[in-house]
């Protein structure tokens, strides 16, 4: 897309993009599907995201660099507007564009592209983190229009699952050992993800070393603190959290255990199938996080310090997509 635009770098479309081969003002002229392909969002949602982050009043005052002689941050001067920088960051997240490519596309140095993306990822992560309690939708609010696929779970508040992201082998030997998972045979960081009955993100932890158990993930995160008595939580069998839920008078919906029996009862089969059908939506949500190519394949050591920020930002950005859980049974679900 940007290759075709290179020869038109000075074309006027409301503002001059005299240095950059690519800028937001050019790309917002693209068809909606093309813009979504590169950023994961439509032009309208991009504008809403920019306003949610404070608009130009806040975004124009972000600081990008430290000088060695003073702790005061310095701000870049140049052609890139706040929207250009947000666009650059979304482009890197969604398409996994390298810093060297961003240098060419936006006609800036590689180090500057790195600082812009780093700053915006940290900024968005901190802003989204402020919304965590609001995002954990109450049971009562979900009851107002609970999707019919959850009609058998009247008090269900959150559906949880754990997911891992592959990382480069850490240089620290202890971190390398703790992040290696025998199951996957490579190094990972692990997150607990929870969604509401409407399919939106309710909760996401910081990243933990990949060898952590699901139960330990529950214990070391603040997840249980968000729950109230008589809430319902849905998970798979691996979390081993019955005692934790009992302590807080929380109902736990998990598939039935066979134990030493040879077969499930008919009631248990129906119950387990209902849970399986409902739990698939958290897996769909996690799949949408991994559509962001910067975290999908390999998180390098250079990005490891902000790995939790990367995944959190991608998870929150999924909330800006159209709902994928049908409210009514007749609706078509797009998975």
For each predicted feature, which ranges?
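Short alpha-helical segment immediately N-terminal to, or the first helix within
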Residues: 90-92
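Short helix-capping and inter-helix turn/linker motifs at the boundaries of alpha-helical repeat units
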Residues: 78-80
């Amino acid at each position: 897309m940007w290759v075709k635009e290179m020869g038109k770098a000075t074309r006027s479309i409301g503002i001059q993009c005299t240095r950059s081969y690519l800028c937001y003002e050019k790309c917002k002229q693209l068809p909606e599907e093309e813009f979504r392909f590169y950023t994961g969002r439509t032009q309208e949602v991009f504008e809403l995201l920019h306003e949610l982050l404070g608009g130009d009043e806040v975004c124009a005052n972000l600081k990008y660099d430290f000088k060695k002689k003073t702790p005061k941050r310095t701000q870049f001067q140049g052609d890139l507007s706040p929207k250009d920088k947000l666009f650059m960051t979304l482009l890197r997240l969604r398409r996994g564009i390298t810093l060297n490519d961003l240098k060419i596309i936006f006609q800036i140095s590689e180090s500057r592209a790195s600082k812009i993306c780093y700053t915006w990822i940290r900024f968005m992560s901190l802003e989204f983190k402020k919304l965590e309690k609001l995002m954990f939708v109450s049971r009562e609010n979900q009851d107002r229009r609970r999707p019919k696929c959850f009609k058998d779970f009247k008090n269900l508040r959150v559906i949880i699952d754990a997911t891992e992201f592959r990382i480069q082998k850490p240089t620290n030997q202890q971190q390398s050992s703790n992040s290696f998972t025998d199951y996957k045979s490579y190094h990972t960081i692990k997150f607990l993800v929870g969604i509401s009955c409407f399919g939106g993100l309710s909760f996401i932890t910081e990243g933990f070393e990949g060898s952590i158990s699901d139960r330990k993930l529950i214990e070391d995160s603040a997840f249980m603190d968000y729950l109230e008595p008589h809430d319902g939580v849905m998970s798979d069998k691996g979390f081993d959290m019955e005692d934790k839920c009992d302590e807080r008078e929380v109902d736990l919906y998990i598939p039935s255990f066979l134990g030493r029996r040879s077969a499930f009862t008919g009631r248990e089969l129906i119950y387990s199938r209902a849970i399986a059908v409902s739990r698939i939506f958290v897996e769909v949500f996690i799949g949408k996080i991994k559509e962001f190519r910067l975290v999908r394949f390999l998180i390098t050591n250079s990005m490891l310090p902000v790995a939790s920020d990367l995944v959190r930002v991608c998870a929150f950005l999924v909330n800006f997509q159209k709902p994928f859980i049908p409210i009514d049974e007749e609706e078509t679900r797009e998975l």
